[in-house]
Structure formats: structure tokens, C-alpha cells
């Protein structure tokens, strides 16, 4: 019910589709409750909800690095996908001082040694909204970048790897490539982005690995914040929502450290 379930969008379901469902829900129940989340702002949606999963993922990854005394500034980041999650992750990574060097789609991946920031991140949204589901046109817009057809970005040397596309997108072979290239941290921002084989390899090699249930909680956390705003008939600013999201992700990381630290110090 409206106080228990948190329906929200995912691949192929955005604010428009949630809006359709919320409209029918209102018609059937004659109630305006915060049942559906990821709604448009005019229906009681929350600011930064579309990018919240990516934002929260970077807050968690940054906490992981800080716990090991590593500064995220200047680190290179390999991101897969080019939808809302990848867009949010690229935006926040850039804001924190990291350099995003890849995005990907079903057709292959983009490697941009100059970094994907500013207008390039905005162009990701243009690619997504085109409906073609391809990233190849990126190199026409930014010729210094390289498009690698039919492959995933995990063969690129990067300090941080962030699967942001779909399930099972990072397998054992990909994990071996990342480990060979001395990746510092892997954050599973997509749901079940890493195969069990890949996860086992990261743990075996003591690579910092953030499981999806922790690192991608920012999306559903912000859905909860959207429900809170609806219940109180309030609309918080983007900065307020972002601050609360940061606090939630900080708390989740603290719990992971508390209960996930092994005798040798590996978390």
C-alpha cells in the first residue's frame, strides 16, 4: 500500500510512464498519495530523483576511498551505460573532481581521454532521448573520442569502474581485465551488474567492491524522500534533497564498515 511499497521507474520506465500509472491510480482510488515515485514535478515528484541513483553511488564510492585514505580528485572513472544512472554518476563524479573517460551502449563503448564533463554529459541525454539506443554518434560530435564497437568499457585502464547499465554486464573476464589494470574500486551501481564470478575475483584479489544493494540505494532512498515530501505536502529544494541523500549514503557505508570488515582489514 501507499505507506509500504515504493514503486519507481527503471529501464524503459521514466517519469512519463510513472505519470500515466499515477494518473490511473488517482482515478481508481480517488486519492492523491505518494504511492508512485519518480513522478513529474507537477504530480508531486522530487528534484534530483532521475539522477539520484548515480549521485548516491558516487557518494558511497567516495566514502569507500576516503576510508582507505584515497582522494577521488584526479581519479579516472570508467562508466557503462548512458541513461539516467550513468548520467547521474558522470555528473557527480565530475563534481567531486574525478575524470569520467567512458560511457557505453548496446552498440559498444566510447573512450574519451579528454574526459566526459560539462556539455558532453548533457549530450548523453541527447543520445538517450534520440531513441536510437546507440552511443556511436558521440565521436561525430567529439572527434578526439574513440568508439569501440561491440565491446564493454572494462578493458580500459581506469582507477574506478562503475557498472551503470544493466545486470550481468561485468563478467569474470572483465573483472580480470580491471584487476590487471590495477583498478582501485568497483561500484555496482546497476542492479546485479557483476556476475558471481566477477564478484569472487574482486574479493579474492582484495579489490574494493561495493555491492549493488548498498551502492545503488540512492534511487530508492530518494523515492522515500519523495514520499516524505508528498506526505508533508512540501517540496524540498534540490540542495536539500541532495544533502539528505548524502547523509543516507554515508550511513549505509558506515553500516557496511561496521559489519563487513574482515580480520585482515578488508571490507
Predicted features along the sequence, with ranges:
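Glycine-rich beta-alpha junction loops
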Residues: 11-17, 105-110, 215-218
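Adenosine-phosphate binding glycine-rich loop
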Residues: 64, 179-267
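A short glycine/serine-rich beta->alpha loop
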Residues: 4-6, 42-49, 208-211, 262-266
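Rossmann-like adenosine-cofactor binding region
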Residues: 108-209, 214
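Flexible, glycine/charged-enriched surface loops at secondary-structure junctions
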Residues: 2-9, 32, 69-76, 256-267
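Glycine-rich phosphate/diphosphate-binding loop of Rossmann-like nucleotide-binding domains
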Residues: 37-40, 45-157
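N-terminal ligand-binding/catalytic initiation module
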Residues: 1-47
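Active-site nucleophile and cofactor-binding loops and adjacent substrate-binding regions
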Residues: 10-11, 46-53, 78-82, 189-191, ...
